[in-house]
Amino acid sequence: MLKKTAFNAPDGQPYQLVQLTNSNGMIVQFMDWGVTWLSCKVPVNGELREVLLGCKVEDYPHQTAYLGASVGRYANRIANAQFALGERTIQLVANQGKHQLHGGKEGFDKRRWKVEECGQNFVRFSLVSPDGDQGFEGNVQVTVIYTLTDENSVKIEYEAESDKDTALNLTNHAYFNLENAEQGSDVRNHTLRLNADFYLPVDGEGIPNSPLKHVVNTSFDFRVAKPITQDFQQGDQVVTKGYDQSFIVNKAWQKPCVLLTSPNEDLSLEVLTSQAALQVYTGNYLAGTPTREGDTYQDFSGIALETQCLPDTPNHPEWQNYCGIQKAGERYYRWTEFRFK
């Protein structure tokens, strides 16, 4: 179902909203501005429960938490807003101090995407990112497909192709709270399990400052499920006020890389992906972000589980075998599936 809002987006045109429903009554909603995942209502014990943090549609351009947005051209950070590509230095638009975050000041989250096709259980959006966009080289054609299945899962597929070599790293920035996403209870009371043996330390600005580290004997060891609170703000988390680090996903696509469980264990979320890494962000700076009810969220109200490449990969050739630099004319394809049980 496609509808337009009575009010306008920053480009002066109405937002276009798409709603999908499955046979179990699960309802998801998306919009063309930023290809944003607006809402996810899952049936739990005979009632629909909102599990996605969100705000009023008209507030999306003003919030800075990237709620539910598709981010690019390069998700996460690129140090000093520049990197070497061949013999050239690519200078990007900085938007977080001297660094670039999530593609720059006018990243993919701040664009109107075209609704290409809307079916019974899916919607497909497209965007053309021109050569020089936020400093990146190459004309890039991007497609995002959201699919809702009757198994209560949401699958996100990213397809892209560039006519020049370019940095490319696409993800969705949804925040989950399986207990209370409307007001945002403390997500640290959830239990988390990660299928990951290595994580990437960063400095206080989110820039990698160390090689990959094994999780053993650290607070980043989630190979056995534990409450997020258990080792919170220990070790390499101190400089980021909580978890805001990337993990290398153990390559077993048929197995979830994430299992998130609500405090009373009445709902869980499994994440499967073809991506190489996962950024876990516990909403350490969510305070002041608007809610759907006109209130504001507090810090730690939701957890972002962003499947992607490692941050700053364009400046680290040793990580580019995972992903991060897209060759001209080659198809980019990544998928992530969020299963609610």
Write out the residue ranges for each language-model feature:
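An exposed, glycine/acidic-rich loop-and-rim segment of catalytic or binding clefts
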Residues: M1-K341
